[in-house]
Amino acid sequence: MLQQFTLLFLYLSIASAKTITGVFDSFNSLTWSNAANYAFKGPGYPTWNAVLGWSLDGTSANPGDTFTLNMPCVFKYTTSQTSVDLTADGVKYATCQFYSGEEFTTFSTLTCTVNDALKSSIKAFGTVTLPIAFNVGGTGSSTDLEDSKCFTAGTNTVTFNDGDKDISIDVEFEKSTVDPSGYLYASRVMPSLNKVTTLFVAPQCENGYTSGTMGFSSSNGDVAIDCSNIHIGITKGLNDWNYPVSSESFSYTKTCTSNGIQIKYQNVPAGYRPFIDAYISATDVNQYTLAYTNDYTCAGSRSQSKPFTLRWTGYKNSDAGSNGIVIVATTRTVTDSTTAVTTLPFNPSVDKTKTIEILQPIPTTTITTSYVGVTTSYSTKTAPIGETATVIVDVPYHTTTTVTSEWTGTITTTTTRTNPTDSIDTVVVQVPSPNPTVSTTEYWSQSYATTTTVTAPPGGTDTVIIREPPNHTVTTTEYWSQSFATTTTVTAPPGETDTVIIREPPNHTVTTTEYWSQSYATTTTVTAPPGGTDTVLIREPPNHTVTTTEYWSQSYATTTTVTAPPGGTDTVIIREPPNYTVTTTEYWSQSYATTTTITAPPGETDTVIIREPPNHTVTTTEYWSQSYATTTTVTAPPGGTDTVLIREPPNHTVTTTEYWSQSYATTTTVTAPPGGTDTVLIREPPNHTVTTTEYWSQSYATTTTVTAPPGGTDTVIIREPPNHTVTTTEYWSQSYATTTTVTAPPGGTDTVIIREPPNYTVTTTEYWSQSFATTTTVTAPPGGTDTVIIYESMSSSKISTSSNDITSIIPSFSRPHYVNSTTSDLSTFESSSMNTPTSISSDGMLLSSTTLVTESETTTESICSDGKECSRLSSSSGIVTNPDSNESSIVTSTVPTASTMSDSLSSTDGISATSSDNVSKSGVSVTTETSVTTIQTTPNPLSSSVTSLTQLSSIPSVSESESKVTFTSNGDNQSGTHDSQSTSTEIEIVTTSSTKVLPPVVSSNTDLTSEPTNTREQPTTLSTTSNSITEDITTSQPTGDNGDNTSSTNPVPTVATSTLASASEEDNKSGSHESASTSLKPSMGENSGLTTSTEIEATTTSPTEAPSPAVSSGTDVTTEPTDTREQPTTLSTTSKTNSESVATTQATNENGGKSPSTDLTSSLTTGTSASTSANSELVTSGSVTGGAVASASNDQSHSTSVTNSNSIVSNTPQTTLSQQVTSSSPSTNTFIASTYDGSGSIIQHSTWLYGLITLLSLFI
């Protein structure tokens, strides 16, 4: 019972084992190590180390499963091992046996068996290194001849396979360094047989061999030749390692013993080389000596005898074994389709014979048939073991067309160009251009003939010397036409009979020809002695006559008689015009065609009957557009193939197009039987995609994909709702208008910037009864003329001016000097004489105004020495009062100023003034140091009568500021025809202050459009810096039309305010921001140019409470719907202001006088980090929201003053004075200040005083 169970288990184990593939999955490397000091890296030299990757998965492989690695063109394993284990982490998962192909097969194998260590839960992988040597030939065996073509010198691809899994690697093989034209030899060890194959190739003879003797032997008795394993042949070529690639039989005589082998040969054709190889057994296969016989005679050359002796050594293969056992190779026939090698079980301690069994498939006999065609077909008639199977190969053969041409080479080449699609090949024979040949034939005393060719170099003349034995001679005498006698010897080819011809001059001859009754002709010559007259009598029978009737192309008949010589046949040719012909073609039952012509008499009609065998028929079924079926037979010409065309109505078709991952398109049609439905499946590669983003009128975004036909480009159209748009109109220095749209990303805000040329300005000054001065600007539409109305107070003022030289330029003042300051807040607003309350329905706010009046006093003292350098000391103080309030805001400012100015020529107080005939050449250098101390107390500047918003301003603020200002101005005269000043001023301001900013308001004369606003107001604290700049502009005296001095001043300063950061809800949560970059740039006429660049760096830390936005009077306001969430924000602002000043110079009038034309277009740009921008257009003597006030006069005072007061600008969109202001966030508290002299003239200030007043405006 146990035995039966054991047998059953063994049977089940064997039955469950299977062959698996794909275990060897990568060819990692193939490197060469020189095992025996070889001269080059040849594929057949040991050792090539192949590193292969393998993997075993326990879920698909089981213990006992086998897998085999086939290694084509591998000769042997160069190792003493017989197997190798596939090991991972020290565990053997499979054992692989080495089987070398050697001389038995063209490949080697590695046969492996899975071990029990592989479990279903294990997946093992690793690498294995196999030491091998490749087979690139070396003998004349069929195995070596096939493998001799495996590789070539250079880069090769080595491919092994494990079932259907191929693994490859590229490797570089070096060519043999041995000269292939000399004698060649090779030796190779076969470890499995413990024998050596030895090869010997005769030296090269280009023109072939006349004879030769070659072979090898051993005189020491340590080598035995195996005469049963010898290959002798001639090869037509060698591979890159000097091994034969072919073997053909030839004529030779062989002598073989155990001590040596030798052959004698003769007449080997050109292009071939004899070779011999044999198996030898040596006492030590790694060290033995052979003596080589090497005698040969090249065609056309002398005999050569060059024997040599070689002592062979090699690497020792431990597989050879030293116990002297006999190794026998046996062959067994199996039913497999390939040849395999196996070693039968062998115990070296018991067995004395080791058997290597070669498993060969059933032998086959090949029967080859041929036909004219292109493709080869194979068929096999199988047979059982012991018999021979038959393989029938139907081989196509081609007919050939030979083209012969000459070339410059020395040998004849034949190239066959095989036509892959037709059965006619072209054989191109290139014959070397032959040397001219001179043949000389001479007789000698020998009884045989010889021919010797003396070959000259190419381009020379070859000489062929023929030596012949003497011929026999026959003498013939004959008459000839000459009047003298000659004797000529006609030499026959050697071995034949020469003829001696004696030619005598002929006798005179009389010939008589006559016809007679006989049917034959006779000629009778009556010969006279030499010198006499011979008589020739010719008797001829009458000629026969043949009449031939033929047709020709003419329309008439002729008869022609052609007379033949006597004994010939006269011909009568009758030519008739051709008959008409009727041809009838009919099919008959025979397999051949005939043509029968029934000829009618001339002038009638001939009949041609063509009988053809029936044509072959091919039936084709196709679909057409009709709804019914038809059958049409297309009859081919006789001998062709008739076509039966069956047209069926088309099947219904269902077409399906789908995209797939490949880069090409395919169309597959599944054809149903007639009457069914065909399916067309189109697979297209995915189209390229172009994405386009556009805006549309809806409030939401969509994405649409427009699919193009296959091969086109799909379009993804993203439609975004339109961005909000903020339109800003500003003036610039050009004479034309432009519109620029700055498009933000989707969801942002687009900005439309309209740039208009500045309007002309007309300034009117009036006096009124109020105690303060105001300036009202009536802004015309772009292209019109703006009007600046200045209302002056009639109250008195006092200005103390101490100057030695400036009295001629700056007049003294008889009444007080006022600076009118107006602060707009959320609850009140008053501008000029207007005081009309206005309310906003959506917010329910009450608007009014509060006027703050500042009275200031300025004392200036100028000291000049030698007219070259002037010093000026100026101080000013002011008081701000609110007439409508019970409490006053008092500002006490002390501004001591010291300045030094110098120029190259004499001037007044450092300011250049010129008459009509004098142009200043001076530059101005000003160095100013200013110290400002301000103490401000502001209990409540608002009127207590406004009860609805009293709490907004009930918190008093006390501000103490200490500032140190340093002005450094360097002048540079950059004049052309007309002189100008260029001044660069750097101002550094450090200020610490605490300021409460009141809510801004909208004036009563404002056209206000309000839309619903969803506003959640929360306190906002800003840290800000506000600068006020007063700029001096000096105008020289020009000459009028007739030389008089006239002045035309048209100052148009432009102030633009912009932000340095973008506003958002999140931005208001930040700590500090940098902002305030102010640049005042004049645009001047062509006759004047003064450029002043002022850089102001101000660092200010000041908490400011910024309430709701407000816009001053004269401004059209549009409020857009917004959703604003105001949150407490503390901003630290740094302002940097650039200010430029312009002084006009003399211009020449068209009548010869000088008339200055001053076009002052100053651009002041201010930015804050509170994420807002406000652009204002400032016209002379105009009131500007969030910007400045400037005034100018056109009289002869030559004095123009521009005061630019910048206030806090917070979260304000871009705004233009004459355009709409759009705001949905806290806006600007406007502080406007103007300086007058009380008489309609504007007080003149220098550039440094302009910057000083800017500083003072922070605190006043």
From Swiss-Prot:
A lipid is attached at G1238 (GPI-anchor amidated glycine). Residues 896-924, 954-1226 are annotated as: Disordered. SUPFAM superfamilies: Bacterial adhesins. GO terms for biological process: adhesion of symbiont to host; cell adhesion; cell adhesion involved in multi-species biofilm formation; cell adhesion involved in single-species biofilm formation; cell-cell adhesion; cellular response to neutral pH; filamentous growth; filamentous growth of a population of unicellular organisms. The keyword Secreted applies. Residues 1239-1260 form a propeptide. This is Agglutinin-like protein 1. Residues 896-918, 964-979, 1002-1062, 1073-1090, 1111-1154 have a biased composition (Polar residues). Belongs to the ALS family. Disulfide bonds join C73-C150, C96-C112, C205-C298, C227-C256. It is a lipid-anchor; GPI-anchor. SMART domains: Candida_ALS_N (SM01056). Induction: Highly expressed in biofilms with down-regulation during later stages of biofilm formation. Expression is repressed by TPK1 and SFL1, and induced by TPK2. Also under the control of TOR1. Down-regulated by Riccardin D, a macrocyclic bisbibenzyl isolated from Chinese liverwort D.hirsute which has an inhibitory effect on biofilms and virulence. Induced by caspofungin. Keywords: Cell adhesion, Cell membrane, Cell wall, Disulfide bond, Glycoprotein, GPI-anchor, Lipoprotein, Membrane, Repeat, Secreted, Signal, Virulence. Each ALS protein has a similar three-domain structure, including a N-ter domain of 433-436 amino acids that is 55-90 percent identical across the family and which mediates adherence to various materials; a central domain of variable numbers of tandemly repeated copies of a 36 amino acid motif; and a C-ter domain that is relatively variable in length and sequence across the family. GO terms for cellular component: cell surface; extracellular region; extracellular vesicle; fungal-type cell wall; hyphal cell wall; plasma membrane; side of membrane; yeast-form cell wall.
